């Protein structure tokens, strides 16, 4: 579940971190964390990109922009449970010139 993955990434169950009014899933060792789980259902296996019908791209880009602005230079990592999802986010961020967030493939071990 998404909650289980968030706990895995952040090391804390059910907590969030708010920095300058912007929500992150957590913070560990000075790094702002976001856990992304189960997005592969929105990704076309043939193209590796989000399906056209997936309406969440703009909100994800908005979330990224708000987090970068709120970070005050702190490192931001978005962790992904699925490698396919990581690649789709790399393409999405690159296409919109989103920089300042490290994308990490981090399956539950």
Pin down the residues of each PLM region:
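Catalytic toxin/effector domains delivered as secreted proteins or via bacterial secretion systems
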Residues: 1-109
